[in-house]
Amino acid sequence: TKGTLDWAYPPFILASTAAALGYEVQIFFTFYGLQLLKKKPNLKVSPLGNPGMPMPMGMDKWFPVLGTAIPGMEAMMTMMMKSKMKAKGIASIEELRSLCLEADVKYIACQMTVDLFDFSPQDLIDGIEFGGAAMFLAFAGDSDICLYV
């Protein structure tokens, strides 16, 4: 994930679904993905450089790509996305994250990245483990399914 709202959903959707189907699930969070483990994530939609993002009101047809770089566009797009998700009954990232933990999905925060970005364990939610890529790969190497999102 890129640590943005729109990129935060796939790992949690896949993990919660896999756990519900009885799979043992682990998610390794590194670099900007660590944003998803913050107690108070401030995730935003990033319309710039996201060509697959459907734009509201047909904006993709009449609003140039550079227009998404206008100050305030990211905040506006984030507000619109959150509003639409709420109207459609889609769980928030915080809700999905909690559901995964309740379903025994194991979260591993990359210790190297935690150190690199000067995160404190107090910045992150409870119930996570800290480890390196080798810790995750020991699990992934024996898995029938391993996805990189």
Please tell me what each predicted stretch does.
Residues V45-M85, G89:
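A glycine-rich helix N-cap at a beta->alpha junction
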Residues L34-P47:
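N-terminal beta-loop-helix "entrance" segment that forms/cooperates
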Residues A19-A20, L101, A140-G141:
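Anion (oxyanion) recognition and catalysis
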Residues A8-G22, I27:
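Histidine-anchored nucleotide/phosphate-binding helix
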Residues E74-M135:
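A charged, amphipathic interaction segment
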Residues A138-Y148:
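Gly/Ser-rich helix-loop-strand patches that form or flank binding pockets
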Residues V25-F31, I108-Q111:
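Short internal beta-strands
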Residues T1-A8, L37-K40, K84-K88:
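Short, glycine-rich nucleotide/cofactor-binding loops
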